[in-house]
Curated annotation (Swiss-Prot):
Similarity field: Belongs to the OPI10 family.
Job of this protein: Acts as a specific nuclear import carrier for HSP70 proteins following heat-shock stress: acts by mediating the nucleoporin-dependent translocation of ATP-bound HSP70 proteins into the nucleus. HSP70 proteins import is required to protect cells from heat shock damages. Does not translocate ADP-bound HSP70 proteins into the nucleus.
GO MF annotations, alphabetized: Hsp70 protein binding; nuclear import signal receptor activity
UniProt gene name: HIKESHI
Regions crossing the membrane: none
Subunit record text: Forms an asymmetric homodimer; required for binding and nuclear import of HSP70 proteins. Interacts with ATP-bound HSP70 proteins. Interacts with NUP62 and NUP153 (via F-X-F-G repeats). Interacts with HSPA8.
UniProt protein name: Protein Hikeshi
Length: 197
């Protein structure tokens, strides 16, 4: 029903069923994992009105599991990418995996999937830094930031006749700012992640 993927590792499709509605994947050597993908295999859909909450569990200093809600998968959203690298020192949250006898070993984390009502999924709050930001939201933010900067800088524009000479201050012509703004927009449209290179 579910699959789990970590970069550089084989895809896991054989989840351990620990209850009728709960499934677990082991993640050995979890300290070296940054992101995990959880997805439906497409062979068995969720029953009508149901979905799956996705949890991440890692052993605390005493070896006890610390569970954190990452998000969910549904028939309408059959896959999700989660960032888990920053979660290993966070606090746990309420979870449905309670006191189940799940075999645990040190340095092995787990992804848990709990089949629940869609209404219940909508009311849950995932841990804040588990979601991977999308390029669209980043592009929107960058566009708003560019617009704000250009509008702010332009609000100080004066003509040469209005300028008061001041040898200690530097001035940037408005057309230079406009040229930078247009160049940045063009590059952002071509590749939203160009700034990483």
């Amino acid at each position: 029903m579910f699959g789990c993927l970590v970069a550089g590792r084989l895809v896991q499709t054989a989840a351990q069923q620990v209850a009728e509605d709960k499934f677990v994947f082991d993640l050995p050597d979890y300290e070296n994992i940054n992101h995990v993908v959880v997805f439906m295999l497409g062979t068995v859909p969720f029953p009508e009105g149901m979905g799956g909450s996705v949890y991440f569990s890692y052993p605390d200093s005493n070896g006890m599991p610390v569970w954190q809600l990452l998000g969910f998968v549904t028939n309408g959203k059959p896959s999700a990418i989660f960032k888990i690298s920053g979660l290993k020192s966070g606090e746990g949250s309420q979870h449905p995996f309670g006191t189940m006898n799940i075999v645990r070993t040190p340095s092995v984390a787990q992804i848990g999937i709990s089949v629940e009502l869609l209404d219940s999924l909508a009311q849950q709050t995932p841990v804040g830094n588990a979601a991977v930001s999308s390029v669209d939201s980043f592009t929107q933010f960058t566009q708003k930031m560019l617009d704000n900067f250009y509008n702010f800088a332009s609000s100080f524009a004066v003509s040469q006749a209005q300028m008061t000479p001041s040898p200690s201050e530097m001035f940037i012509p408005a057309n230079v700012v406009l040229k930078w703004y247009e160049n940045f927009q063009r590059r952002l449209a071509q590749n939203p992640l160009f700034w990483k290179t």
